[in-house]
Swiss-Prot record:
Residues 307-330 have a biased composition (Basic and acidic residues). This is Free fatty acid receptor 3. Residues 307-346 are annotated as: Disordered. The keyword Ion transport does not apply. Pfam families: 7tm_1 (PF00001). Keywords: Cell membrane, Disulfide bond, G-protein coupled receptor, Glycoprotein, Immunity, Inflammatory response, Lipid-binding, Membrane, Receptor, Transducer, Transmembrane, Transmembrane helix.
């Protein structure tokens, strides 16, 4: 007799979901921490507007990764929510907000890059740092305001049933909840995905055209890498996820495959470091220098550990030799006190 939990609300493999979350966490966290160190160092030396935007994007990715273990616990528990309920809407709010923050900041970075190349003289005479700060605040507010729908849905109607009949978190919805959620999702897909995608596509297409006419090969390669990483984010990580919003609005319910395209959207935290890497030659130089320092510290630690092991092994060998030396010394002292015959016989 099957006594396992009812998973009619989720027909997929929850261990696959857990594996994707775990992979994202293990790969994305160290990469974004390295990027955070580089951006903080750059802003302390010579602050640039694009670095302000990318620093906010890094902070957004780290926020997603820090809350990802909650999703991992949920997946390991068969897509049930075993944690205190107050953490359910909070984790959902952080999760979806950071996803859309990436799209907004990528669009802002594309505008910044386009202006610096298409209008270099005008760009240099403008106070970009203050504007970059205001744009960052606007992006955080815009994404947060839209994704606050998580709280509206979770606490609308009968709160006692807000976790669904299976104790789930933001997986099951009543008809009155879907009447609110599906139109909001469609609006989010248009405002927070389609519009940033159009802006980013225009800016980078113009940027490639300008550099193709007279830019250096090194700069062309860097822009090509930046464009590839950005399009990978939009088309692979975010595209299918936002398509599920459109399909859900048309069908009147969330599609069954939505959970899997949501997994794709979490992978953006692993792709964003490549956006940082191709964003500027200065980031590449600082990143390589940081890696050299870390490798040097690792080599120094290994050398010190090896020396400690050798000293420890040498000390053990000396302690093992002391009883034999003591026995030999006592034997020779006995021979010197009149036991020559016995010593000779031995």
């Amino acid at each position: 007799m099957d006594t396992g939990p009812d998973q009619s609300y989720f027909s997929g493999n929850h261990w696959f979901v857990f594996s994707v979350y775990l992979l994202t966490f293990l790969v994305g966290l160290p990469l974004n921490l390295l990027a955070l160190v580089v951006f903080v160092g750059k802003l302390q030396r010579r602050p640039v507007a694009v670095d302000v935007l990318l620093l906010n994007l890094t902070a957004s990715d780290l926020l997603l990764l820090l809350f990802l273990p909650f999703r991992m616990v949920e997946a390991a528990n068969g897509m049930h929510w075993p944690l205190p309920f107050i953490l359910c809407p909070l984790s959902g709010f952080i999760f979806f907000t950071t996803i859309y923050l990436t799209a907004l900041f990528l669009a802002a970075v594309s505008i910044e890059r386009f202006l610096s190349v298409a209008h270099p003289l005008w760009y240099k005479t403008r106070p970009r740092l203050g504007q970059a700060g205001l744009v960052s605040v606007a992006c955080w507010l815009l994404a947060s305001a839209h994704c606050s729908v998580v709280y509206v849905i979770e606490f609308s109607g009968d709160i006692s049933h807000s976790q669904g009949t299976n104790g789930t978190c933001y997986l099951e919805f009543r008809k009155d909840q879907l009447a609110i959620l599906l139109p909001v999702r469609l609006e989010m897909a248009v405002v927070l995905f389609v519009v940033p995608l159009i802006i980013t596509s225009y800016c980078y297409s113009r940027l490639v055209w300008i550099l193709g006419r007279g830019g250096s090969h090194r700069r062309q390669r860097r822009v090509a890498g930046l464009l590839a990483a950005t399009l990978l984010n939009f088309l692979v990580c975010f595209g299918p996820y936002n398509v599920s919003h459109v399909v859900g609005y048309i069908c009147g319910e969330s599609p069954a495959w939505r959970i899997y395209v949501t997994l794709l959207s979490t992978l953006n935290s692993c792709v964003d470091p490549f956006v940082y890497y191709f964003s500027s030659s200065g980031f590449q130089a600082d990143f390589h220098e940081l890696l050299r320092r870390l490798c040097g510290l690792w080599g120094q630690w290994q050398q010190e550990s090896s020396m400690e092991l050798k000293e420890q092994k040498g000390g053990e060998e000396q302690r093992a030799d002391r009883p034999a030396e003591r026995k030999t010394s006592e034997h020779s002292q006995g021979c010197g006190t009149g036991g020559q015959v016995a010593c000779a016989e031995s």
